[in-house]
């Protein structure tokens, strides 16, 4: 398998990547610099994409031969997957986004594990983008100007039950390979985020799905498990343009396609300032995991919002015990979801973790992870809305301090970052010249307007030196690296 023009034909099943072929250490550098190793990895990626397409076409009853080729732009950290003639998704099935976007995630994972740095992945179909085939349907609507003072948000949490035609069977839209159903789990994340946005950002929050536990009359399922389409049908029965865009479609799952569009249609109807969509991700490979945030390929102006949210999620999630190494992407990714294309306001999609990975499933069911991840989403949005940059929390250096014996002295502290109040400054002992004479302290600060200052005291009659380590910790558990300084008790 040499050269970059290897284009496998869809004929096989099974994953071509497994743990032994993933690069590490010196192999990563080799793949990036060795043309032969690079070509080998690209060929393996092409085989993996072809294998996934085979299974997808088998499941849809449309198996046929389709070539697949891949090009990677190392400079722009991007990948282009090109399908040959015979595969062209259409409006029925929402342009296969529930197949193509998970495929992109797995290809990104395998590329990075093999030593190729990839962030954005796009697709061509016989040499053209989907927008070239469907220019009217996939056009991004004109975007409203972002208001300096924002007042409202739509939180859209996952999918929910839809009805299949013609038998009218009711099914969840997402699989649950490890027993965690995204369609029932994500609304609790929406509840968490709604409370945080209302409390910390001061916005009115609307929800795309009902949270009622009463039964939906037609399905007999709880309203809170139904998709947005049926909730909006109940709210606006006359607005079929909002929730019933494909009444004449022959597709069995046409109401799934309508549901994807109903959520941003509702955001446009409300005129909210931002749309935040929450999901869990899934992959054919149980190895793929972690937190991702997406903006639409044709709405690059939404990338700063997506990056800010991802940055804040990383900061707060990794501040929690047990989650210091939780995988979170460094940069948001461009994709072509319908959910964040149709909205006329900034719209991003948060894939909190993978419901197909055992470690991620454990995290998704942990209230600590749920709270931390949604605090990150809210904080990232709030910083973006205020024009602030997400940056690490860090204490400024603290100079050594002399304090007269039997007196005290206030010492001001500076920091960078955007901590959540109340704050605590924790002073721990590194050394003390007189055993038992020095005491660790914690000082709490509730008012973000007042400057930070700690009081250092020398209460005894004798002189001496204590070396202290200071840590600034915020209400979300985010802490600075320790800063060491000395306090000397001196005679006047």
What are these regions (language model features)?
Residues 54-84:
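Short edge beta-strands and adjacent turn/loop segments
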């Amino acid at each position: 398998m040499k050269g970059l023009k290897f284009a496998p034909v869809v004929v096989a099943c099974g994953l071509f990547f497994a743990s032994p072929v993933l690069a590490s250490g010196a192999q990563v550098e080799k793949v990036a610099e060795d043309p032969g190793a690079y070509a080998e990895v690209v060929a393996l990626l092409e085989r993996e994409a072809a294998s996934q397409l085979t299974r997808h076409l088998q499941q849809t009853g449309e198996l046929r031969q389709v070539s697949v080729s891949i090009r990677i732009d190392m400079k722009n950290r991007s990948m282009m997957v090109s399908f040959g003639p015979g595969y062209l998704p259409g409006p029925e099935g929402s342009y296969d986004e529930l197949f193509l976007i998970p495929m992109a995630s797995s290809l990104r994972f395998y590329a990075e594990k093999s030593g190729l740095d990839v962030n954005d992945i796009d697709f061509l179909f016989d040499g053209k983008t989907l927008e070239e085939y469907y220019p009217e349907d996939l056009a991004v609507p004109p975007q409203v100007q972002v208001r300096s003072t924002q007042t409202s948000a739509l939180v859209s949490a996952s999918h929910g039950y839809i009805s299949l035609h013609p038998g009218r069977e009711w099914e969840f839209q997402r699989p649950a390979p490890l027993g965690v159903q995204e369609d029932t789990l994500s609304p609790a994340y929406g509840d968490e985020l709604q409370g945080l946005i209302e409390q910390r950002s001061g916005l009115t929050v609307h929800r795309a799905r009902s949270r009622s536990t009463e039964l939906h009359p037609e399905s007999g399922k709880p309203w809170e498990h139904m998709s947005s389409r049926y909730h909006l049908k109940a709210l606006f029965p006359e607005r079929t343009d909002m929730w019933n865009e494909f009444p004449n479609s022959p597709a069995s799952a046409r109401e799934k396609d309508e549901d994807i569009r109903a959520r941003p249609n509702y955001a446009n109807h409300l005129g909210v300032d931002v749309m935040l969509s929450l999901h869990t991700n899934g992959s054919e490979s149980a190895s793929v995991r972690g937190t991702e945030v997406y903006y639409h390929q044709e709405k690059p102006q939404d990338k700063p919002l997506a990056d800010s949210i991802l940055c804040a999620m990383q900061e707060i999630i990794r501040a929690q015990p047990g989650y210091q190494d939780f995988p979170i992407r460094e940069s948001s990714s461009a994709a072509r979801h319908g959910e964040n294309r149709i909205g006329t306001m900034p719209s991003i999609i948060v894939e909190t973790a993978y419901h197909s990975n055992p470690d991620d499933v454990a995290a998704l069911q942990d209230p600590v992870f749920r709270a931390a991840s949604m605090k990150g989403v809210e904080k990232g949005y709030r910083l973006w809305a205020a024009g602030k940059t997400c940056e690490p929390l860090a204490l400024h250096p603290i100079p050594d301090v002399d304090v007269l014996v039997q007196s005290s002295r206030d010492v001001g502290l500076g920091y960078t970052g955007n901590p959540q109040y109340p704050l605590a400054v924790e002073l721990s002992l590194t050394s003390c010249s007189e055993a038992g004479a020095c005491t660790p302290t914690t000082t709490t600060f509730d008012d973000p307007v007042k400057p930070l200052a700690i009081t250092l005291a020398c209460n005894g009659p004798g002189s001496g030196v204590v070396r202290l380590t200071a840590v600034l910790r915020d209400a979300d558990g985010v802490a600075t690296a320790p800063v060491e300084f000395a306090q000397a008790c001196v005679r006047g």
